[in-house]
Amino acid sequence: MSTTSRVGSNEVKMEGQKRKVVSDPTHVTLKVKGQDEEDFRVFWVRRNAKLLKMMELYTKMRGIEWNTFRFLFDGSRIREYHTPDELERKDGDEIDAMLCQQSGFGPSSIKFRV
């Protein structure tokens, strides 16, 4: 089963996990893997389309707002305005989707004894 989301001239297609990756000069197939190793989605994206559409679709499928995830490729953050061509992505490249974790250690949590 595959679903397609089309917004303007940008197209993002999500394919089932067992589909074979097909090479296309105008599109690239990207795998997005969540923190749990079992969960991954395959997207067929135009090479010149901003990755925001893919990010929104992935997070919508997970039921979480897109800005709560950080998308990484080889440890480098991918922003919503990047395109696969700008990042020189190839068919089958894997993108990691990590939940944003914010923590801090501030002065109010430190107690000194004199």
Swiss-Prot record:
Q: Where is this region: Disordered?
A: 1-20
Origin superkingdom? Eukaryota
Q: What is its main location?
A: nucleus
Its annotated compartments are: Nucleus; Cytoplasm
Q: What are the entry keywords?
A: Cytoplasm, Isopeptide bond, Nucleus, Ubl conjugation pathway
Cross-link position per record: Glycyl lysine isopeptide (Gly-Lys) (interchain with K-? in acceptor proteins): 104
What range(s) does the Ubiquitin-like domain occupy? 26-104
Record-linked InterPro entries = Rad60/SUMO-like_dom, Ubiquitin-like_dom, Ubiquitin-like_domsf
- CDD domains given for it? Ubl_SUMO_like
Q: Which GO terms describe its cellular component?
A: cytoplasm; nucleus
Q: Which Pfam families does this chain map to?
A: Rad60-SLD
The record's section on PANTHER family has:
SMALL UBIQUITIN-RELATED MODIFIER (PTHR10562)
Q: Summarize the subunit comment.
A: Interacts with SAE2, SCE1, SIZ1 and MMS21 Covalently attached to a number of proteins.
- What is known about what this protein does? Ubiquitin-like protein which can be covalently attached to target lysines as a monomer. Does not seem to be involved in protein degradation and may function as an antagonist of ubiquitin in the degradation process.
What family does the database annotate? Belongs to the ubiquitin family. SUMO subfamily.
Q: What else is known?
A: Stress conditions rapidly and substantially elevates the amount of SUMO1 and SUMO2 conjugates with a concomitant reduction in the amount of free SUMO proteins. The SUMO conjugation system plays an important function in stress protection and/or repair.
Supply the name of the protein: Putative small ubiquitin-related modifier 4
Q: Could you tell me which species this protein originates from?
A: Arabidopsis thaliana
